[in-house]
Amino acid sequence: VPISPVCDLAPLMDTTMNEVLRIDAAEAQAESPVNMGPPHGLDLSIWVGADERPAFLEQAGQLARAWGARRVVEEGKHHFDVIDGLTDPDSPMIKALLGLK
């Protein structure tokens, strides 16, 4: 269950963060999960908060499409609290992680 994933590193090349990261086009292509095949034998869900920045929502959608996975957009959650479900053993996120849906 990728949570708020950054799955395509190419957009980072055009940010000031890349002064530190130093990602080039070849590395962005090779290291971006969206360009890799999905893990085999897993029922995947890509989790993202509905109140996240548009880039995170798009990246989650992009990965879900590329991997043929379900995208879960959790209402009322943002990038820093979308992981709250990890603390609740009965949460939909934990059920997805355990394959219980």
Per-region residue spans from a language model:
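Alpha/beta-hydrolase superfamily serine-hydrolase fold, recognizing
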Residues: 1-101
